[in-house]
């Protein structure tokens, strides 16, 4: 019985890496006017969610951050949420 528990405890847990939702064919383009898309990448408090959580690639994360900042500047998105 204890051998089974030891084998289960030693078994490594490999989580499959998510793919970038903006890479590939037929995907949504990052646009500062697309508020519904941008709101999925903003936390409840209005902060930009990091790419390690959303699995967005580094290049697309920069585009996303710039689009969010541009939308905030134009008043389409709030800077902070109460």
Swiss-Prot record:
InterPro entries found in the cross-reference section: Ribosomal_bS18, Ribosomal_bS18_CS, Ribosomal_bS18_sf
Gene Ontology terms, MF aspect: small ribosomal subunit rRNA binding; structural constituent of ribosome
Keywords recorded for this protein, A-Z: Ribonucleoprotein, Ribosomal protein, RNA-binding, rRNA-binding
Cross-referenced PROSITE patterns: RIBOSOMAL_S18
GO cellular component, one term: cytosolic small ribosomal subunit
Role summary: Binds as a heterodimer with protein bS6 to the central domain of the 16S rRNA, where it helps stabilize the platform of the 30S subunit.
Family: Belongs to the bacterial ribosomal protein bS18 family.
Protein name as it appears in the record: Small ribosomal subunit protein bS18
Organism of derivation: Bartonella bacilliformis (strain ATCC 35685 / KC583 / Herrer 020/F12,63)
């Amino acid at each position: 019985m204890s051998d089974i528990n030891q084998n289960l405890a030693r078994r490594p847990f490999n989580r499959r890496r998510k793919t970038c939702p903006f890479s590939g064919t037929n995907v949504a383009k990052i646009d500062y006017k697309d508020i519904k898309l941008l709101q999925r990448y903003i936390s409840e408090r209005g902060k930009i969610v990091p790419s390690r959580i959303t699995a967005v690639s580094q290049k697309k994360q920069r585009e996303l951050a710039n689009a969010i900042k541009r939308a905030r500047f134009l008043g389409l998105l709030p800077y902070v949420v109460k």
